[in-house]
Amino acid sequence: IHHLQVARVTNLSRAIDWLKEQGIWVAGAAGESQTRWFEFDFTLPVTIVLGSEGSGLRANIRKKCDALLSLPMLGRVKSLNVGAAAAVFFYEVVRQRLLNSQKK
């Protein structure tokens, strides 16, 4: 629970297909999603897909995701930069898995 694997791939679409074949859920960061980041079960085997800061996830990648999750913002800021968004998502993964391990 104290280690998260990070991967950079050259073909994201094929990588997502492979991950799904391995039984791994794919959660994409999408600001307009109605599902907030903490509502997803990150105790599952999951990968988080983050888009570019300017345009987010491409349409074909969004369609491949099992869930689209948002980090709602207040005020004039529309979104976090990708590094800050990654930190929020990764912290939530660790938080849920830590809570889950304490229940056992």
Q: Where in this protein do the model-derived segments appear?
A:
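RNA substrate-binding interface of SAM-dependent RNA methyltransferases
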Residues: I1-T35
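Residue-level recognition of oxygen-bearing side chains
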Residues: N11, P45, A85
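Short, basic, helix/turn surface patches
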Residues: V6-A15, S55-K63, Q102
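Active-site/ligand-binding-proximal alpha/beta "capping" segment
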Residues: A27-N81
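Surface-exposed beta-strand edges and their flanking turn/coil or helix-capping segments
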Residues: E21-Q22, D41, S52, G83-A84, ...
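Structured adenosyl-cofactor binding patch, chiefly the S-adenosyl-L-methionine
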Residues: H2, A59-K104
